[in-house]
Amino acid sequence: MRTKQLWQVALGDLAKRVSRANFETWLKHTELVALEGERATIAAPSSFAAEQLRNKFAADIQETLSLLLGRPIAVHFTVHGQDDEEHPVQRRPQRRALASEEGSASKQLSLTPSPEHGLNPRYTFEKFVVGPNNRLAHAAALAVADRPGEKFNPLFIYGGVGLGKTHLLHAIGHRALANRPTLKVCYVSSEVFTNELINAIRHQRTDDFRNRYRTIDILMIDDIQFIAGKESTQEEFFHTFNALYQSGKQIVISSDRPPRLIPDLADRLRSRFEGGLLADIQPPDLETRQAILIEKGRELGVQMPSDVVEFVARRIESNIRELEGALNRIVALAQLTHQPITLALAVEALREGDARAVREQLTPELVLHAVCQHFRVSLAELVGPGRRREIVLPRQIAMYLLREELGLSLVEIGQRLGGRDHTTVLHGVDKVEEQLRSDEQLRADVLAVRARLYEDAKAPLASRH
């Protein structure tokens, strides 16, 4: 399997392991740029993103690639367009050394202006499939890229998950830079913006932060809905918005909903967002879905038979990301089994790999059952007051999986596990996350429980076929 296709399959697995917000912010725009023996190099859009990947997701990436390739893989991180790599993630890092690296990296984080724009080279206008569902957003994005700051300012693009909002933001940046290479263009997610602000406040470098974001020609901020309820972030973004707008600079914003439906958003921000052009993106129709599959197949270097294209397009109606995921599973199965892509193979690939359908079957009861089965403890022991390590570890893994797989709140998890306090749950989740970076046995246990959980969840689906 080629590196591009391997990474698409890996991303499909990683999307099941981490929260949607984390996947969208940190993993979605990465690439596997090199695979040499037992060494994989992952490229991120910026040094800050590479930093977050190394600190938060290295263990999951390493585990996924090792499983797919059938051999231990060491993961390295770099930045798009840079030859010098970030420090590798060792397969057996010492916990003390890991903590030291994280601390020093945090101190070295630069907030001064840099040439990094955070753009993904795959997301261009040429690769964006236009249909009735996105025609207005596409036309507005083109106009903004060609004449930034002159009209449609701000441009606010909204729509459901996986419909192409992020693609358009990156495409604006690429086209604007192609027209005027000296422009200062910046793409950033609202979560990265918030994290950089927190880091700047912590290290007393807010002036650097403001200089960075208020001297940009085109600022594109993704998933603005995540700043809702964050007063300090909203305050800083409000002043950044005003500074750029008054200087005639272009602002492009994306969200999963229109401004009026974003809860806990400051009225003054809502007013400014609504003062520009609001362009929505709807789910693609059948013809657009077919065109997307053909284009994505071309990018992967495969020609999709027309009956397979129609089958997948009719089967998946919700969003583009699920279309891409289905295509990746089909291509991966064909290459792994050395078979041509046929309708029968596509049916098999989607039946076995319909992660969304399996995920919908997950329940707290299934999680607790899988943990009990793997560790051979009873449910009464798991939710009871016992504090033996043989019980505490499975309980903490249950907390972690209830959080990661089902997205339950800390309070809900505590209620499921014998009425425990939310601080106890938070400690358990954090401890598992921390130890997953260095404890190979724990990673194996979590992987085994997760595999058992998904097998249990597949059972009701299998009975339907």
UniProtKB/Swiss-Prot annotation:
ATP binds at residues 162, 164-166. CDD domains: AAA, Bac_DnaA_C. Its main location: cytoplasm. Residues 335-465 are annotated as: Domain IV, binds dsDNA. PROSITE patterns: DNAA. GO terms for molecular function: ATP binding; ATP hydrolysis activity; DNA replication origin binding; lipid binding. Residues 118-334 are annotated as: Domain III, AAA+ region. Residues 103-113 have a biased composition (Polar residues). Pfam families: Bac_DnaA, Bac_DnaA_C, DnaA_N. InterPro entries: AAA+_ATPase, Chromosome_initiator_DnaA, Chromosome_initiator_DnaA-like, Chromosome_initiator_DnaA_CS, DnaA_C, DnaA_dom, DnaA_N_dom, DnaA_N_sf. Residues 80-118 are annotated as: Disordered. Residues 72-117 are annotated as: Domain II. Residues 1-72 are annotated as: Domain I, interacts with DnaA modulators. Keywords: ATP-binding, Cytoplasm, DNA replication, DNA-binding, Lipid-binding, Nucleotide-binding. SMART domains: AAA, Bac_DnaA_C. Plays an essential role in the initiation and regulation of chromosomal replication. ATP-DnaA binds to the origin of replication (oriC) to initiate formation of the DNA replication initiation complex once per cell cycle. Binds the DnaA box (a 9 base pair repeat at the origin) and separates the double-stranded (ds)DNA. Forms a right-handed helical filament on oriC DNA; dsDNA binds to the exterior of the filament while single-stranded (ss)DNA is stabiized in the filament's interior. Oligomerizes as a right-handed, spiral filament on DNA at oriC. This is Chromosomal replication initiator protein DnaA.
